[in-house]
Curated annotation (Swiss-Prot):
Modification Phosphoserine, positions: 75, 79
Family: Belongs to the SPOT14 family.
One of the record's GO cellular component terms: cytosol
Subunit structure: Homodimer in the absence of THRSP. Heterodimer with THRSP. The homodimer interacts with ACACA and ACACB. Promotes polymerization of Acetyl-CoA carboxylase to form complexes that contain MID1IP1 and ACACA and/or ACACB. Interaction with THRSP interferes with ACACA binding.
Pfam families: Spot_14
Modified residues (N-acetylmethionine): 1
Chain's role: Plays a role in the regulation of lipogenesis in liver. Up-regulates ACACA enzyme activity. Required for efficient lipid biosynthesis, including triacylglycerol, diacylglycerol and phospholipid. Involved in stabilization of microtubules.
Primary localization class, coarse: nucleus
Record-given protein name: Mid1-interacting protein 1
Compartments reported by the entry: Nucleus; Cytoplasm; Cytoplasm, Cytoskeleton
Length: 183
């Protein structure tokens, strides 16, 4: 009885969510033999064009909190997974997030102020700026509540990114004509 309960809890652990995401991205990486074929190919699958917005730093290693630019008519709320992005952009983002999980997030210097990227995205070191969590009046209950809130959010984002990696892999297989391979 105890083993069944432990197995259920392990299935929903953060470690397993990270492993599922890393496994999906590894599968995507092994399937996509020629990533350049993904350039300029729109990802028409609506399952990939929704609500996860993350920005990769200019050097490809740092996740940044962002102040989104004004969305144009072709974007879905200005998110990274907007329809205007091609499959290659999705591929690079998913691999970058996998590397951040496996190797850690390195703080990258912000892009130059005059650059296009610098005007659209406001860099902020989200790992170091924890001052708002360390308020003098914050009790232990608040920390526990914040921890559980962020843990649920991280688990949700990892699940969505895993699904997105699987969708991209299947879409690539359709594009090059071997949609039934590996099933």
């Amino acid at each position: 009885m105890m083993q069944i309960c432990d197995t259920y809890n392990q299935k929903h652990s953060l470690f397993n969510a990270m492993n599922r995401f890393i496994g999906a991205v590894n599968n995507m990486d092994q399937t996509v033999m020629v990533p350049s074929l993904l350039r300029d190919v729109p990802l028409a699958d609506p399952g990939l064009d929704n609500d996860v917005g993350v920005e990769v730093g200019g050097s490809g290693g740092c996740l940044e909190e962002r102040t989104p630019p004004v969305p144009d008519s072709g974007s879905a709320n200005g998110s990274f997974f907007a329809p205007s992005r091609d499959m290659y952009s999705h591929y690079v983002l998913l691999k970058s997030i996998r590397n951040d999980i496996e190797w850690g997030v390195l703080h990258q210097p912000p892009p130059p102020a005059g650059s296009e990227e610098g005007s659209a995205w406001k860099s902020k070191d989200i790992l170091v700026d924890l001052g708002h969590l360390e308020g003098a009046d914050a009790g232990e209950e608040d920390l526990e509540q914040q921890f559980h809130y962020h843990l649920r959010g991280l688990h949700t984002v990892l699940s969505k990114l895993t699904r997105k990696a699987n969708i991209l892999t299947n879409r690539y297989k359709q594009e090059i004509g071997f949609g039934n391979w590996g099933h």
